[in-house]
Amino acid sequence: MLYLCGGKILRVKRILDIIKDWMLPIAIVLGIVSYLILHFIPVLHENVEPWFSVFAKDVQPVFVATMLFLQFNKISPHDLKIKRWHFALLAFQLVSFAAMALLAAGLPEGDWKILAESAMLCFVCPTAAAAGVITDKLGGSLSDTVTYVVMINVAATIFIPLAIPVVKDTGDMTFIQYVLAISKRIFPLLVLPLLLAWAIRYGWRKLQRKLMRYTHWAFYFWGISLCLSIYLATRATVTSGISLWIGIAIAAISLAACMLQFWFGHHVAGSGSRSDSITAGQALGQKNSGFLIWVGYSFLTPVTSVAGGLYSIWQNLVNSLELFQAKKHKTA
């Protein structure tokens, strides 16, 4: 009897290990396929897709916030230290963003302006809050990732409101209104889990020690969040109504921006440790694609939101490759 129970436990463990190893590609495929099924089967498109899309949009940030809370339990405020490569990444994002914004501002309304706006968004978009999960698995520094997540989110909150009125006629919205709109989108997801984790760390150490046992659950919350994110990204792309050539052009621009930022991040910190190279690559390459989609749809030409959906797919394909290479290197 014990032998049978032990065999079942081993089988379950093997299944969980397989899911863990293949979580990222599983989430990508499941997110894409699930939306396409709901979109192209008429009865599901009418009765299921509308409410499930609203559900996915509402619940996805909850999974991200829970994941961040579990991760932040591992980090002390003293662990957040700014390094030189943090400033290099910040300068790269802001200079690239400014260059694309000036280009977009000088172009008339039309396809070329859409492409410039798409590139602009791909460069300024803040680091994904979930970047620490992959960074941690690859052997990078979670605390250094969180440091840059905070830095770029603060910078984006200031610089995006400065650039948008230059690129697009935005009516009566003021700088402060832009800042407040973006802050409401960013900070509840990032700041509240951080403050809660640190409040527990310094006010309820016994609970904090118990929560430390469950920090590995952050990976599974990330997997669910990623699946929903890919679902929403696929929906934004399919329902955009863009022409074929614009779709291909935005795909090419978002892919180029993705590869360039992963490459620059890895190389700008290459003179440091391997951990720094991994961390900088993830900090610059991984983007909060949901935020990118929202800014494009809300303040710029709406079809630029497609860049966010496509960037999400590219960055997760890069992450899949990096995780595969890391596992291969580990077993070699």
Report the location of each language-model feature.
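Alpha-helical transmembrane segments of multi-pass small-molecule/ion transporters
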Residues: L2-A332
